[in-house]
Design a protein with these regions (language model features):
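Mg2+-dependent prenyl diphosphate-binding active-site environment of isoprenoid biosynthetic enzymes
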Residues: 25-265, 275, 335
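Hydrophobic packing residues in well-ordered alpha-helices of helical domains and bundles
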Residues: 6, 10, 14, 68-71, ...
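Short, amphipathic C-terminal "tail helix"
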Residues: 306, 321-342
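Surface-exposed helix-capping loop/turn segments at secondary-structure junctions
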Residues: 131, 315-324
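N-terminal amphipathic/basic leader segments beginning at the initiator methionine
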Residues: 1-25
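Double-stranded RNA-binding/processing signature
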Residues: 3, 82, 327
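Mobile late-domain/C-terminal helix-loop "cap" segments
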Residues: 265-317
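Hydrophobic, well-ordered secondary-structure elements that form the walls
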Residues: 252, 310, 330
């Protein structure tokens, strides 16, 4: 794995996208509790996977950075809007080594900022028609529309499980949920959009679905693993937060399927409490159970298997393309998704 190339290109495309985001955020009132806050999460320095995947795929298929720029900006605006809303919904305390927006302000202001960023994401899409033409721009718009729909449906599934305190979930339920919540907006649509732009619409976008799904699932599972075992400073969020929030991760589902009836009853009782009433000692005990039943190791193995499947799909659809640093970047980012520490 070429870490140097991958990090350099993520940084390059991330900076380009961030610069574009700043140009689209209005410089007018009300600044203090809206427009200035819209710079906050993007400026904290995320990984930049989504714009990186979009731009690199576009270039690998013969397009240019300029062709993909507006779509990449939209993807990152929507991503940060989702993060603001997710932090409110999960009652999270930290994001990228800083207090979450609703902790810095309040929930009402954070929700409003997220709403405004979602709306702002439409503006770059409108600009696409001047570079890509109306027909292709409309196709890209529909891709974004489906991205938002799939993501919110997946989030609804997960929030509903927590509300109903579901303890009967299977791994198949989990994979259906992350397909919607994570895979479409993290990998499937960024790759599809990049390929559509790079080929000027002359490609079957559906052939990238398996690649994006395997990549997105590997990414999400690794993210869930890191929430339990990562260095908090590197990870940027509170370690073990997913247990406190009651998220139905692959590890929690594996644990519930393999633990004793007494331990399962303990889990059910723990998850029935409101988030702020859940005790750290109980969360630590659940983490110990996950280690005892090899739930974390099983999740790591699943993530590696999915990354291997993603690589096979990548070679199927990208091997015929000319050699380029963007093509190399896309191959390396699949490996990075399961080897990363943050």
């Amino acid at each position: 794995m070429n870490n140097t190339l991958m990090k350099e290109m993520l940084s390059r495309y991330g900076k380009l996208t961030l610069s574009g985001i700043h140009t689209f955020i209005p410089n007018k009132e009300p600044k203090e509790y809206l427009y200035d806050l819209m710079h906050d999460y993007p400026d904290r320095g995320g990984k930049g996977f989504r714009p990186g995947l979009c731009i690199a795929t576009c270039k690998a298929f013969g397009g240019s950075v300029k062709d993909a720029e507006f779509s990449a900006i939209t993807l990152e605006l929507l991503h940060n809007a989702f993060l603001i809303h997710d932090d409110v919904e999960d009652e999270s305390f930290n994001r990228r080594n800083k207090p979450t927006m609703h902790q810095l302000t309040n929930k009402a202001i954070a929700i409003n900022v997220g709403d405004a960023m979602n709306a702002l994401g439409l503006y770059p899409l409108f600009q696409n028609k001047y570079r890509l033409g109306e027909k292709l721009s409309e196709i890209i718009f529909l891709e974004i529309q489906n991205l938002v729909t799939e993501s919110t449906e997946g989030q609804a599934m997960e929030l509903g499980w927590r509300l109903e305190n579901r303890i009967d979930l299977t791994e198949a339920d989990y994979f259906r949920m992350i397909l919607k919540k994570t895979c479409w907006y993290t990998c499937m649509h960024p790759i599809r959009i990049g390929a559509l732009i790079g080929t000027k619409g002359y490609i079957d976008k559906k052939k990238f679905n398996r690649l994006g799904y395997f990549m997105g699932a590997a990414f999400q599972i690794q993210d869930d693993v890191l929430n339990l075992v990562a260095n908090e400073e590197e990870y940027g969020k509170e370690i073990g937060g997913d247990i406190l929030e009651g998220k139905r991760t692959l590890m929690l589902i594996h644990l519930m399927e393999n633990c004793t009836p007494k331990e399962k009853l303990f889990l059910q009782n723990y998850l029935s409490f409101p988030i702020l009433e859940r005790k750290q000692d109980a969360a630590k005990y659940i983490l110990e159970l996950m280690h005892r039943y090899n739930s974390i190791e099983e999740a790591k193995n699943t993530s590696k298997f999915l990354a291997g499947a993603a690589l096979k799909e990548f070679y199927t659809h990208f091997s015929q393309l000319p050699a380029s640093e963007d093509k190399d970047f896309l191959e390396n980012i699949i490996l990075y998704m399961i080897n990363r520490n943050y």
